[in-house]
Amino acid sequence: MKTRNLTLVLAGLAMLGPFATDTFLPSFPAISTHFDVSSVLVQQTLSVYLAAYAFMTLFYGTLSDSFGRRPVILASLLIFAIGSIGAAFAPSFGWLLFFRGMQGASAGAGRVIGQAIVRDSLAGAAAQKMLANIMMVFGIAPAIAPIIGGWLHVAYGWQSTFVFTFSVTVLLALACLKGLPESLAVGQRQPFHPGNIARNYWLALRHRAFLLRSLAVAFAFGGFALYIASAPHFILELLGLPETAFGWMFIPMVAGLVGGSALSGKLAHTVKSAVLVRWGLLAMAATGALNIAYNHWFAASIPFAVVPVMLYAFGMSLALPGMTMSTLDIFPQMRGLAASLQNFVQMLVFALVSGFVAPLLFDSAFKLALGQASAVVLAAVFWWLGSRQVTGQGASAIIKTT
């Protein structure tokens, strides 16, 4: 498969998660009314999804190390399709939460296994460039998903957003059946021994550099995720915009993602990964300070309230390809496992931000700015601490257990 086509397929698989997260955001008030539940309880449809997503990322990489990349991806798409159509016709709020959990449990496979496929197929700057290109294409999803969701909601009701994600899943499954190659040869697969797998996870979590770098990636993304989780309140209440106006936040956000990813990919062969990470973290820190200053002195309004969100996304997408690649490379023989754990930590932080942090902060634009700045400070501290650790010791320990 050509590199360009592989990039598009992997980006499409990675986009499935943002579609499931963002398409139904404009429908939060309608879901609250339909099931007669509070807005805080509706927020848990996002938290349940993210918690299931985080938990299952622990298994997809390991399963793909044992059974191959392609079969696990195809199985996950089937489960996601069932969850999507079930959510569309959920008879009660409890069933909606159940089917959202099914979506979350399967949405992460493409993202996790896609990272492993990149590292199976490419190395060094070429791998970093593909990861950056995937992020650039993947970044379109958060922009178009809430816009599509808003128009679908207005035209057909909140259930139509889940019918839409079902349709996208079917198209992705057809694309994978036709063109996704198997990147892990049978001779390279790891035996499926649950005891050894559990020990491998434990050893990886005890590897300080891996854990610290995974936390750095998670909190760098967490400052971005805070605004995604708070989007219904930020856009509909703080900015006073209608359901069809989610593009005011998500289009600038994705412009930053695409711009940072494009620059990261362009510089991958000429600038060291560590330097790009440093530049990205500095950009995020400067943006956090700007966001605090703006919301301290002025009331949040369009277009100025979304500029810091765009700049933060730019810095994050400049840094994350290098941060992700160096984290996975700590365990070169078990990249599926490493990708699972790294994504588990990232999505666990996202779930905590969505379920607990966002409800504490989304009533104030200034509080959201403080939350974003705190996230980048934590990311920088964890990355600095992780960079000081000696890497490689966990890799040899894990190889011996298989």
Segments from the language model and where they lie:
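Conserved MFS/SLC helix-loop-helix module at the cytosolic interface between two early adjacent transmembrane helices
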Residues: F55-G94
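Structural signature of the two symmetry-related core transmembrane helices
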Residues: P71-I85, F166, L276-N291
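Extracellular/periplasmic helix-loop-helix junction of adjacent transmembrane segments
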Residues: S27-F55
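Cytoplasmic helix-loop-helix junction between adjacent transmembrane helices
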Residues: F99-I140
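Juxtamembrane intracellular "pre-TM" segments in multi-pass secondary transporters
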Residues: S183-S214
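Paired small-residue
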Residues: I79, G83-G86, G94-M102, P303-V309
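Helix-loop-helix hairpin linking two adjacent transmembrane segments in secondary transporters
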Residues: W95, A132-K178
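Helix-breaking motifs and short loop linkers at transmembrane-helix boundaries and internal kinks
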Residues: H34-D36, G68, F89-W95, S106, ...
